[in-house]
From Swiss-Prot:
Broad enzyme group: hydrolase
Tissue specificity comment: Expressed in chorionic epithelium (trophectoderm).
Identification of the protein by name: Pregnancy-associated glycoprotein 63J
GO cellular component: extracellular region
Record note on modification: N-glycosylated.
Length: 15
């Protein structure tokens, strides 16, 4: 279910 897709934007916002 969007493994990456969800982790990609999530990490960007965390930074």
């Amino acid at each position: 279910r969007g493994s990456x897709l969800t982790i990609l934007p999530l990490r960007n916002i965390s930074d």
